[in-house]
């Protein structure tokens, strides 16, 4: 199926050679996206990445200034999918029990009762996650990984699906607690959200002059679970798996890929969770685009989102104002993509 990637080869076309996969659940997902866009103007990449994480079963970290529809996006998504939504504003005085819950003594009943916290929902917005101390961040990230919480001697499972969308403000750094590398690694993707285009902003302002737009429930959570199962059956050519691993390896050992200029910029490269997240999210993106197989364009489209928060840059990179995206641009250009026969093999 694949040719060795040691020699640069011509890029294969990104147009699939077979008819798009069309099933009822995926068509409903498209309908759900249209319904969400009735409320959210622009921010197409953020909306698509939210759906990618939903289908892939991962969590999303968003970096952007306030006012870019992050809260409205996940709240609207919850309404369209019929799930429960909670928002937690992270502050320095927050404690873990404010998130996960606690046991409360009831004198009238002569015993303790468990009061579950706001993490027990389908869609959780952790707003400005870097404003809470490390123990609170750890409590949330443990729930993200385990999908359960232990309070006292009892274990409580969060409802499925469970999506955490955490935000960070890139402007304000005073009074913040940066996420440790081992914890930020738990997020499947990290995206950078910028200001909308002028025509999109005009639409936003025009909509604000009228009544709030209501949305319908389009895709039940049961159908979302079917989509998640379908995402796991999307075919990934072994050559693309090797390509994802090579991209990660190039962030760790850039000299081996002819990236000597990058060696002084990266202290630690992407962990093995990087290519795992990249391949998993590429599967979800292929499903959203109507294919039952991954193409190289899916991988390339998600490399930065899957890797940027997993790189630890050197002081030299910071002094030169070089970003993780600068490093990844060089990596993408240096690592040759494999030539593939597009489509799912008959035996796959």
What are the residue ranges of the model-derived segments?
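P-loop (Walker A) phosphate-binding loop of NTP-binding proteins
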Residues: 65, 99, 167
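Canonical AAA+ ATPase core
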Residues: 106-111, 128, 132-136, 144-234, ...
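Conserved C-terminal "switch" segment of AAA+ ATPases
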Residues: 18-26, 39-40, 176, 190-261, ...
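C-terminal engagement/docking regions of AAA+ P-loop ATPases
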Residues: 2-15, 19-22, 256-348
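Conserved alpha-helical scaffold flanking the Walker A/P-loop in AAA+ ATPase domains
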Residues: 49-52, 105-125, 154
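Walker A/P-loop
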Residues: 54-91
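Pre-Walker A (pre-P-loop) alpha-helix and adjacent loop at the N terminus of AAA/AAA+ ATPase modules
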Residues: 22-68
């Amino acid at each position: 199926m694949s040719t060795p990637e040691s020699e640069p080869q011509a890029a294969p076309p990104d147009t699939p050679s077979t008819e798009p996969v069309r099933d009822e659940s995926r068509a409903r997902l498209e309908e759900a996206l249209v319904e969400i866009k009735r409320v959210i103007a622009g921010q197409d990449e953020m909306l698509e990445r939210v759906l990618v994480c939903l289908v892939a079963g991962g969590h999303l970290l968003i970096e952007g200034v306030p006012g870019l529809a992050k809260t409205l996006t996940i709240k609207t998504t919850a309404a369209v999918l019929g799930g429960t939504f909670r928002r937690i504003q992270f502050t320095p005085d927050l404690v873990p029990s404010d998130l996960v819950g606690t046991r409360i003594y009831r004198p009238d009943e002569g015993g303790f009762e468990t009061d579950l916290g706001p993490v027990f929902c389908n869609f959780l917005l952790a707003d400005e996650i870097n404003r809470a101390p490390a123990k609170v961040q750890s409590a949330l990230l443990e729930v993200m990984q385990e999908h359960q919480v232990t309070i006292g001697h009892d274990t409580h499972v969060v409802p499925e699906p469970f999506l955490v969308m955490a935000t960070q403000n890139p402007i304000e750094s005073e009074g913040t607690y940066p996420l440790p590398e081992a914890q930020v690694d738990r997020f499947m993707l990290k995206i950078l959200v910028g200001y909308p285009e002028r025509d999109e902003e005009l639409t936003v302002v025009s909509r604000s002059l009228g009544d709030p737009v209501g949305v319908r429930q389009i895709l039940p959570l049961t159908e979302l679970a079917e989509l998640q199962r379908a995402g796991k059956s999307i075919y990934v050519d072994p050559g693309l798996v090797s390509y994802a691993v090579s991209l990660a390896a190039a962030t760790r050992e850039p000299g081996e890929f002819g990236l000597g200029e990058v060696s002084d910029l990266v202290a630690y490269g992407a962990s093995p969770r990087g290519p795992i997240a990249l391949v998993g999210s590429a599967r979800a993106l292929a499903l959203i685009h109507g294919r039952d197989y991954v193409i190289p364009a899916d991988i390339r489209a998600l490399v930065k989102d899957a890797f940027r928060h997993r790189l630890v840059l050197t002081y030299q990179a910071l002094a030169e104002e070089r970003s993780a995206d600068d490093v990844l641009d060089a990596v993408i250009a240096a690592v040759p993509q494999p030539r593939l026969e597009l489509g799912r093999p008959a035996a796959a």
